[in-house]
Amino acid sequence: MKHGFIKVAAATPRVTVADCKANGEEILKAIHEMEKEHVKLMVFPEFCITGYTCHDLFLQRCLLDSAWDELLHIADETKETDALIFVGLPLRHRGKLYNVAAALNHGRIVGFVPKTHIPNYNEFYEQRQFAGAEEEDVEFVDFLKGVKNEEDEFWDEIPFGTDLIFECEEFPEFTVAAELCEDLWVPAPPSIRHAINGAHIIVNLSASDEMVGKDSYRRTLVSGQSARLICGYIYASAGEGESTQDLVFGGQNMIAENGSMLAESRRFENGIIYSEIDVQRLADERRRMSTYPAVSTCSHTRVGFSVEEEETELTRTYPQYPFVPSVKEERDERCEEILNIQAMGLKKRMEHIHSKSAVVGLSGGLDSTLALLVMVRAFDRMGMPREQIHCVTMPCFGTTDRTYQNACKLSCCLGAKLTEVNIKEAVNIHFRDIGHDDSVHDVTYE
């Protein structure tokens, strides 16, 4: 957690449809595995306690009771787990049934986030069982009445609502909000509100089925949302074990940060992916972007959670040359773009001043070579002859035969005029004028 890095994970455990006890054991197994990696934010799929494909079994009291009991069991078993954990289950509230993400921390249920957008098109018919959440004030509800006694730490009322931001007490920039599956696919996802109200990480508990080509679209959604909101985005989806009666789930898990995909699972394999999200960098980037809205302190409810601060061992990698793509095709495309941008700028300037020629100092090194290539492209776009480009090479003490020959060949191949002005004697005269010994290669010499 130090220096802004938060160790995070997205997990897809094997699920047994409608067997909450078995699913709870798989969830706990995954939690203990993530504990070994010192993960501070753990995200599981939508309906991971029951399975997504329970269909009308969701309307059965026995399944709902079993899911609730298993949530309490998972909470009780994770009292010593130093992390914020998100799991999915069905939850009864005010006579309706909701698809919720439950947030757990040190054995406590710290919040319920209901799904806002309930799909009822194509292969989805969730409205048959579930109600969509309203964007309204967060309620504090005594869900545990009659389940725990008054001396038990569970006795606190639990916040229920879409507009919850979970804020780490030890590290205020570690702020998390949740949305569920379809919420990301709509024109205005809840994560927009969450981000502009201070959430640096969005978690998505999902059960997204597989269709040909859907994985790339899903990836674009996740990376694009993380870029647009300048946030970390953790996407955990259902996988093997769900019913394949009419759908197949591939368990495509992703962790993205500000448009970059930090980690992605192999589809059709259950498991866990890990990475580190730099929330301090995200906060800095938001401050730099003058059009990013100021954080509102009144529209969302802040819910505190606690994790210990410790060193984070980095598994994510940073490129040695961040501005130079390692893939040749991408590198060629980037170089082409650089040339076009600079050539367009030069073309506009030359047309504005009605210039018919240009002069460039050509040493044979990288900088002057790029300048000449840009100039050639600008002249070609203006339909002007390259002979009007005047290259001047000025060999001196530091000029090697290689760079000198490069300058000569480059101008010749590109059809530009070349003039050589040897400046050795002029520099020696200047050294004598200022009283500097030309054998002393210090700052003055350079």
What are the functions of these language-model segments?
Residues 1-361, 372-373, 377-388, 402, ...:
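Enzyme catalytic cores with a strong preference for nitrogen-chemistry domains
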Residues 342, 365, 395:
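Conserved hydrophobic/aromatic pocket- or pore-lining residues that grip, position, or stack substrates
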Residues 368:
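Catalytic nucleophile loop
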Residues 384, 394-446:
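ATP-dependent adenylate-handling ligase core
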